[in-house]
Amino acid sequence: MAKNTKLWGGRFEGTVEDWVERFGASISFDQKLAKFDVIGSLAHVQMLGQTGILSLEESEKIQVGLKELLEELEAGQLDFDIANEDIHMNMEVLLTEKIGPLAGKLHTARSRNDQVATDMHLYLKEQLGYVLDKLAHLKGVLLDLAENHVATIMPGYTHLQHAQPISFAYHLMAYYNMFQRDSERFEFNQKHTDLCPLGAAALAGTTFPIDRQLSSDLLEFKQPYTNSLDAVSDRDFILEFLSNASILMMHMSRFCEEMINWCSFEYQFITLSDTFTIGSSIMPQKKNPDMAELIRGKTGRVYGHLFGLLTVMKSLPLAYNKDLQEDKEGMFDTVETILNSLDVLAGMLSSLQVNKEKMQESTEKDFSNATELADYLAGKGLPFREAHEVVGRLVLDSIKSAKNLQDWTLEELQTYHSLITEDIYVYLQPKTAVQRRNSLGGTGFDQVEYQIAVAKKANEAKK
């Protein structure tokens, strides 16, 4: 019987068949962790040297070999072999080819369990920084757009029906606040990712006199995990990321859904740049909002990655199980998806053309000023419920007569209630309706300018 030549093969008499090997291998995707695997190994072997577990000479020779591997990796000169299963075994084999049997000492006081957890913490910690940078850029684009459209008036909707006139900037600031909370969630995610699993070993720690604090400091983590079993068993930092990413994608998807509607012939509120639209292969007139639709569509795949990993984790006993190999591809794909989506959404918004006239025109139809008349009557002492009923009858009669509220004469309006006077026509103007809503968080122009100023100040403080 052929001897098992795997680095872990001492206990085995038989060999693994190729098709089984292909099923179990992860190198096709976990090679994304190669840089972090080398960085983690450099910290580990430096710690081994400083604690006397390896001689300083041994530690330095291994570090030289690892640094050479890192240079070759960055130059695209490393080839990985599926026979070596995963990125950890591939890197150890490559190191052995470079420095000989001394490479075998690198794995002293370390398991692949804490090794892969360390790689993934390092990877996600870096990616969270990129996500937050792109979110900050998107929020900046939103603020710039909002600042230019405080006085641009559009219909506000409930149930996709005209509700009340609002400032377009106000609508944009609603999304700004959603994205701000997304940023805060990712920042909290950083806290849980900024923990070092290295030195946890397989699950129970090690008998070697390692210095886990030193390893953590070398890798610039805030602190080591305080329980080794926890360090190698859980992937909640990834689940937290996938959850945050799902909420972010939901917010982007909702925004894209609105832009898809707004650029349609039925709305004509905005025009998307040609850069973010695609034509039809058969209909020459078409300009389709494909990029917005793709963000909306990709939201589902991010949700899927979250539910997939939750399902993997739900019944796993402590500590490590091979099921955890399934934690990576969804994370990698989610990172790529949200980074690209943030770029595309920011690009769409920065090149957006706003049709102010169409927005304004739309507010003058479908009775979005009806609440103004009800508030007007309530402000003159009429109980709001009675005012609501009066205006409801007027709206019904307006529909039957094909009129807008402002089309009725004063004498006609006074037949509905005597409290209505000449000044009602000012109140029925969309601009007045917006301007008067200056309660905290309202759509009044002063309030919107205040919201923008507060947001800009907070953004500047973050820089």
UniProtKB/Swiss-Prot annotation:
GO MF term set: argininosuccinate lyase activity
InterPro entries with a match to the protein in the record: Arg_succ_lyase_C, Argininosuccinate_lyase, Fumarase/histidase_N, Fumarate_lyase_CS, Fumarate_lyase_fam, Fumarate_lyase_N, L-Aspartase-like
EC number: 4.3.2.1
Keywords from the named record: Amino-acid biosynthesis, Arginine biosynthesis, Cytoplasm, Lyase
Catalytic activity: 2-(N(omega)-L-arginino)succinate = fumarate + L-arginine
Keyword Cytoplasm: yes
GO CC terms: cytosol
Pathway: Amino-acid biosynthesis; L-arginine biosynthesis; L-arginine from L-ornithine and carbamoyl phosphate: step 3/3
Coiled coil: none
UniProt keyword Secreted present: no
PANTHER family xrefs: ARGININOSUCCINATE LYASE
NCBIfam families cross-referenced by the UniProt entry: argH (TIGR00838)
Protein's name in the database: Argininosuccinate lyase
